[in-house]
Amino acid sequence: MEYHIRQYDLHQGALEIEYIEEYFGEFPRKKTADEVIRRLTDRDHQIVMAEAPLTDDPGTVVPVAYKVSHELRQNETDLKLADLVERLTGTVEFFGRKVLYSWIGGTRRDWRGQGFFRALTEEQEAWALDNGFDEILTKTKNRLYSMRGTLDHLEFNVIKLEPNEQDNRESKVYLSKKLGLEVLDRHRSKRSVIHSN
């Protein structure tokens, strides 16, 4: 199967993210286009979506999965990102390296288990290597078992667990993947990428 991926510029991509997140009931708070723009402005970033035809109407193509990632710097001024860097200090080396943070993403329920998230992640890795990144970081919740399993299959390593004392399922799990050309050799998805402006 060939996966069709669309890579967006900042403003159009932010609108697309606001739209697709409406399909994710498991996200308690959806990202707005303004929030995405504020987070990504003035930093290297990537917004990608996988598209597929509807099974009952193959002429209609819809977004089924997405990923948004951005550069994470040692000296962040954004309070949330500065807090993230602080939490990872001693675990991740930021000095003299480019680190990509896989911020948000997901696959619509009816499309899960079909390789869309793998294809987006592999495209993210190829883009990251092309743009000089050394490592990809991501964060998930302990209760998101299928996401943790997918990240394991994609060879992300757990680098930190931040326990939640009230409910272990809400504990934060930080994962990392160091990048090198050998990462591309392990890619399995066939992808075509369209750049939208």
Indicate residue ranges for each PLM-predicted region:
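Conserved acetyl-CoA-binding loop-helix of GNAT-fold acetyltransferases
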Residues: T107, G113-A126
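Conserved acyl-donor/pantetheine-binding loop and adjacent beta-alpha core of acyl/acetyltransferases
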Residues: D57-I104, E165-Q166
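C-terminal "cap" of GNAT-fold acetyltransferases
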Residues: P163-N197
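Conserved active-site alpha-helix within GNAT-family acetyltransferase domains
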Residues: R118, D130, N142-L161, N168
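Conserved GNAT acetyl-CoA-binding A-motif
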Residues: V99, A128-K141
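Hydrophobic adenine-recognition pocket in adenosine-nucleotide-binding enzymes
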Residues: G105-T107, T140
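Short amphipathic alpha-helix that is part of the acyltransferase structural core
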Residues: M1-V64
